[in-house]
């Protein structure tokens, strides 16, 4: 019979797990560390999650918008492959870019400036919305090769290649400014957006910038760089 749940305690445990994974990495995190950070005993922690793997799955699901309070307790232990697949699915769902899908479907956009601005803005919003999950995955990928491959090679690099192909097509049609190397240009676009939508929150001065003003300026400046 499932044990009665305490939503507040579950939230505290998952928040503690997120902070511990983000600070120590996946391999460096221990269940006892999470229990101490959550202010619970290790024994109680295991009544919520069977293992470190289960805790990581809980964190990823919560950051992906899953109602973890509806999950049966204790959460079972997934395999490493299942964890990597969960991260891949969660990030793919969070960073869908409909404006790029629409751009790929036409060779004659009615307004190239609006198209580029829309793509930049949607990238910004997608990264901003899942920045906590992105930071977690980036940190844990440092000591988890399979996760690194899923995130960087099968995830980010695939998207960078797609963005570069978009720039190639629009450049060949004369719709955007000439670009010598669209591979570098795609990384410039994505890394610029990623710093302002995500990494600046870990920067001493960057975190103080006004959120709305940052979004407006990033969209305007990147659009101007590409369209002229």
Give residue ranges: language-model regions.
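C-terminal alpha-helix
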Residues: 220-228
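Hydrophobic/aromatic-rich alpha-helical bundle segments in the mid-to-C-terminal region
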Residues: 101, 105-106, 134, 149-153, ...
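Short loop-to-helix capping motifs
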Residues: 24, 51, 129-131, 143-145
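Helix-turn-helix
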Residues: 12, 20-67, 72
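Amphipathic alpha-helical linker/stalk segments
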Residues: 59-116
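A short secondary-structure junction motif
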Residues: 66, 94-97, 130, 134, ...
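Amphipathic alpha-helical packing segments from all-alpha helical-bundle domains
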Residues: 110-138, 146-173, 220
């Amino acid at each position: 019979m499932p044990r009665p749940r305490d939503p507040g305690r579950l939230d505290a445990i998952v928040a503690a797990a997120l902070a511990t994974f983000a600070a120590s990495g996946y391999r460096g995190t221990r269940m006892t560390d999470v229990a101490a950070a959550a202010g619970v005993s290790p024994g109680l922690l295991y009544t919520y999650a069977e293992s470190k793997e289960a805790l990581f799955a809980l964190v990823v699901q919560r950051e992906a918008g899953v109602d973890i309070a509806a999950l049966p307790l204790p959460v079972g232990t997934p395999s490493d492959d299942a964890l990597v697949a969960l991260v891949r699915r969660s990030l793919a769902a969070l960073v869908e870019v409909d404006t790029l899908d629409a751009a790929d479907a036409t060779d004659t956009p009615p307004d190239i400036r609006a198209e580029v601005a829309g793509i930049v803005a949607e990238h910004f919003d997608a990264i901003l919305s899942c920045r906590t999950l992105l930071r977690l995955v980036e940190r844990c990928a440092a000591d988890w090769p399979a996760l690194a491959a899923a995130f960087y090679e099968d995830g980010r690099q695939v998207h960078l290649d797609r963005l570069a192909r978009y720039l190639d097509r629009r450049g060949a049609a004369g719709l955007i400014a000439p670009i010598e190397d669209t591979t570098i240009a795609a990384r410039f676009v994505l890394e610029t957006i990623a710093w302002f939508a995500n990494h600046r929150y870990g920067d001493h001065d960057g975190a103080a910038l006004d959120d709305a003003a940052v979004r407006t300026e990033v969209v305007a400046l990147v659009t101007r760089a590409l369209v002229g």
